[in-house]
A protein has these predicted regions:
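A generic, well-ordered mixed alpha/beta core segment in the N-terminal half of proteins
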Residues: 103, 107-150
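Histidine-centered, transition-metal-coordinating active-site segments
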Residues: 1-83, 87-93, 100-101, 133-341
Length: 341
């Protein structure tokens, strides 16, 4: 009989009974940097997921570019839709391998919170400008640790923080759920970026490398299903999350194709404009840091001004960045004797 037991305790029992021995059980979390009163209903990983969803940084993802700047259609991918794709794929992998779905989902929802406006162009610009460099995964961790909640951060669990920091392909997550998110990120962005490129008229289906298509499938749903199925067959019952060599090679071939034909060529004029805007604003706020919003000024007590300027710029949406740039550098028109100046 479990009806009278606390909801969270029932969750712990179910995880102990049904999750893989290699999964991170919610009851085994290493905890938070600051102790908190436990929730009677939610596990710590479930609380992390909710905190991320309700954060301001998560809300702003809907107006941050994935690949195509300010697309005019309704169905192009943004950072928010990419994040939701990653969360769905990560949960599917976790479910197939009997891993902790709540942990995988929380990591996935937080993995891109520190991404810049204007996609990877913005990241490259800030990396070049900042003396300490800039990586969106490191900034995502700073968002949840420091920037959110007026400098208090979200106080997430160690496992979610690790997964956010280590989600890049070069990372080494401490949990299998973190590995699942890293793979899900790659699966998601390669496939939906192909969709966007075809939608924009830059690619045709027939342009894709046929060796990779033969392995993975023609349609997005086929490719995603092929990879998740392969991960399951390769990883079930083991202490890892892997693709087979054949499928991994096909994914890498698609990724290389996209870098050669899309990521390095997409709307060069817009990329140049984005670089000029971010460079100009970076220089302006370094010179006049007192003109930063108050919430960022408050962070300056514990970080150099270069970091605080990067905090502000990386947190902008595409539209907000354009608006701030115009407000700083584009003269307003006004009427003088009936003539607009």
């Amino acid at each position: 009989m479990t009806e009278g037991r606390p909801v969270k305790e029932r969750t712990y029992e179910m995880e102990s009974r049904y999750l893989s021995p290699y999964a991170k059980k919610s009851a085994e979390t290493a905890g938070r940097a600051r102790e908190e009163v436990p929730c009677a209903f939610r596990t710590d990983f479930q609380r992390d997921r909710d905190r991320i969803i309700y954060s301001n940084s998560f809300k702003r993802l809907k107006n941050k570019t994935q690949v195509f700047f300010a697309p005019e259609g309704d169905h192009y991918i943004t950072r928010l839709t990419h994040t939701l794709d990653v969360a769905q794929i990560a949960r599917a992998i976790a479910r197939a391998l009997s891993l902790n779905e709540d942990l995988a989902e929380a990591i996935a929802l937080g993995h891109d919170l520190g991404h810049t406006p204007f996609g990877h162009v913005g990241e490259r610009v800030l990396d070049k400008l900042s003396p300490s460099g800039f990586e969106h995964n490191v900034q995502s961790l700073r968002v949840v640790d420091v920037i959110e909640k007026d400098g208090r951060g979200l106080n997430l669990t160690a496992e979610v923080r690790d997964g956010i920091l280590q989600h890049k392909s070069s990372g080494h997550p401490a949990t299998l759920e973190g590995v699942a998110v890293s793979l899900a990120d790659r699966i998601a962005y390669i496939n939906h970026d192909i969709e966007d490129a075809i939608r924009a008229g830059i690619l045709k289906d027939s342009d894709l490398p046929q060796n990779a298509v033969a392995v993975l499938g023609h349609a997005t749903r086929e490719r995603i299903n092929t990879v998740i199925t392969d991960i399951y067959l390769r990883s079930a019952g083991t202490d890892g999350v892997h693709m087979s060599e054949n499928v991994a090679d096909a994914m890498n071939e698609l990724r290389s194709f996209m870098f050669r034909n899309i990521y390095s060529l997409t709307n060069k004029s817009m990329q140049d404009r984005a670089e000029r805007m971010l460079t100009a604003m970076y220089g302006y706020f370094l010179r006049y840091p007192e003109r930063l919003p108050e919430q960022y000024l408050a962070l300056a007590e514990n970080a150099p001004k270069e970091q605080i300027v990067c905090d502000y710029l990386s947190g902008m949406t595409d539209r907000y960045a354009i608006g701030v740039f115009e407000g700083l550098f584009i003269p307003e028109t006004f009427s003088l004797g009936g003539v607009t100046v």
